[in-house]
Amino acid sequence: MDYLEIHSENFDDIVEDIKQRNLSRNNMPKIIVGTGLSVIYGVPGMKKLAEHLAKEIAQSSDQQLKEIWKNHCDEIEANGLEAGLANIAQNENDLVDAIKPITAKFILESEEKLHRTIYEKDTGFCRLLNYLSGTVSVDKKIIDIMTPNYDRIIEIICDKLGIGVITGFYGSLYGKFSRNLLKQPTEVYNCKNYSWIRLFKPHGSINWISENGKEYLTNDYEILKEKAEYIEIVTPGSSKYKVGMTNNTFRCMREEFNELLNPRDNYSLLIYGYGFNDDHFDTALFDSFQKNVLILSRDVKPDIINKALEKKNITVFYHEDDREYMIYKSKKYTIDVPVWDINQFADLFIG
């Protein structure tokens, strides 16, 4: 296996090639963002959530709930929350119902404490969005992002950068969902003179409320705190596909983003901090692996690494066994810098 120093002439050519294939106007990336982004801002990821759920359930008076958790806790500790609850039985759905409001409240309260930090902190992700907003097509200044994250980090960053966010909801205090806002944003928004992020959240968001058949988006923290049990998210343990198909907003988010992954269009994929834990969405994503793909993630599943070793259009930066790696044009290298870290990536590719 070859060794490459990042700050060398040999790597300069690789940087320029990746920028052309993955970060240019002609190959504007569709971006998939996982919990790797949440972690760098201090918002709890799945590991911290699992610890919090364990503590909350231990304090519950519901013995059946404790028993169900006990049945899965070894798997959760060994393979993470999502994998540990992936095969939850039909008669164990009480656990899923219980963890939804706990999860919503935990993420909401954690994020609320960090709003100022998120807004003020300069990260590689900020620089990436700022760079892409200046690179995007002059005719349609829209950058598409899909995230399974519940938090509002992306929205806060966009406010900081002065980039508008198209969420699919319209209204000021109590936004209502309209599929057409996602599908045809140019009918409503000025996408020629201003840059926009079109944000798809197929697993919901901590500012979505669904109560008594009515759904709305609000950023009023007091309302969200009061209505935490009605926050609309798909939690670990849920049948993501089933919930995603029965909830209209989740389904629209998924379907509209999948439609953007059209093989006839020019685009690339930039996947950051995403764990590939949604089988049905990942199937659509893998179909787009014929395009140029750039993956930045500390931990990458073996099957993704194997795909990169087979396909020259997939570039991966990741960490394994205390070493940093790059797979580039089907060849694996050890490198001297953790380029999977978005801050390091931005230093190298954006400056």
Feature map (PLM): residue ranges:
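Gly/serine-rich nucleotide phosphate-binding loop at the start of the catalytic core
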Residues: M1-I156
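Short, flexible loop segments at boundaries between secondary-structure elements
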Residues: D62-Q64, G175-Y189, I295-K307
